[in-house]
């Protein structure tokens, strides 16, 4: 758990540093119009001296202009670090239950748990990028970046094929395939998570589906539900802490998680509106993407 906490904390710092050039660019190029309007509306007793304020804004602009090129030079290091760190804490999340063979149902307990959690996080990551990109395109009325998303979608089915091969091959090696089709409580949850991932990823083998925003969205949702359920199965459904011990998240815990998600959505909306997160459509060849999207969707 210490390793997981340390990796997540470090990873969060790395993500902030990766995003910092965008913030610095905004500080350097912005006219600070909203901030100036806010200051102008302050009561005279609270309003700062305008000349000093203008000087401080110029200082912030100049500092941002000096720091950003320096950060750009070392950004590749943080990008590599940002890719490496998740492989550590994601596999560690699987390793946590290696010491509990008597408490985790045999359908999920395996020596391959670190590998399965690592592959699981990768295909979930690609799927959430597809889901978020499509939702953002509709929410902010931007063209869907179908070319880039279809490229990601080509990778997902092969990753899930490896994951499913390890899952099913391990069950066969441990003589647990019969337990997987017993259709009891644990078997149903196992089949549900495997089925959702298999169906969602299997759809992406078809080129027409990969070029259809609607079907890309459906497949991403199925994979996310199946991949997320796999983790619930390992840590909640299939885990038995022992006689007299039970655990399920309380309403307060669930609401805290919901609040975190709501805060992340709010922060996302603020950031994409305040800093240049989205690329300019005219500079990235998406002027005709709406037409391409509709044509490909009809073909699918």
Task: Provide a role label for each language-model segment.
Residues 1-209, 282-288:
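Long, contiguous internal "core" modules enriched in hydrophobic/ aromatic residues
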């Amino acid at each position: 758990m210490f390793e997981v906490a340390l990796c997540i904390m470090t990873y969060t710092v790395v993500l902030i540093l990766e995003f910092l050039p965008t913030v610095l660019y905004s500080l350097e190029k912005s006219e600070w119009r909203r901030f100036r309007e806010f200051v102008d509306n302050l009561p005279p007793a609270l309003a700062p001296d305008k000349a000093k304020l203008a000087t401080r804004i110029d200082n912030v602009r100049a500092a941002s202009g000096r720091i950003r090129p320096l950060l750009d030079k070392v950004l590749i290091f943080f990008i590599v670090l940002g890719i490496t760190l998740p492989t550590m804490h994601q596999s560690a999340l699987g390793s946590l239950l290696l010491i509990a063979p008597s408490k985790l149902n045999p359908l999920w307990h395996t020596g391959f748990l670190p590998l399965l959690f690592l592959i699981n996080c990768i295909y979930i990551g690609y799927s959430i990028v597809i889901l978020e990109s499509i939702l953002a395109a509709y929410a902010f009325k931007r063209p869907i970046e179908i070319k880039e998303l279809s490229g990601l979608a080509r990778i997902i089915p092969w990753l899930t094929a490896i994951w499913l091969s390890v899952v099913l091959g391990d069950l066969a090696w441990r003589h647990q395939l019969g337990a997987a089709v017993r259709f009891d409580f644990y078997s149903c949850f196992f089949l549900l998570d495997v089925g959702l991932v298999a169906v969602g990823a299997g759809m992406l083998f078809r080129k027409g589906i990969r070029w259809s925003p609607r079907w890309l969205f459906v497949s991403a949702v199925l994979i996310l539900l199946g991949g997320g359920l796999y983790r619930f199965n390992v840590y909640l459904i299939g885990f038995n802490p022992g006689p007299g011990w039970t655990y399920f998240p309380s309403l307060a815990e669930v609401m805290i998680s919901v609040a975190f998600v709501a805060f992340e959505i709010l922060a996302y909306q603020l950031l994409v509106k305040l800093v240049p997160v989205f690329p300019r459509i005219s500079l990235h060849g998406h002027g005709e993407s709406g037409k391409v999207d509709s044509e490909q969707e009809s073909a699918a």
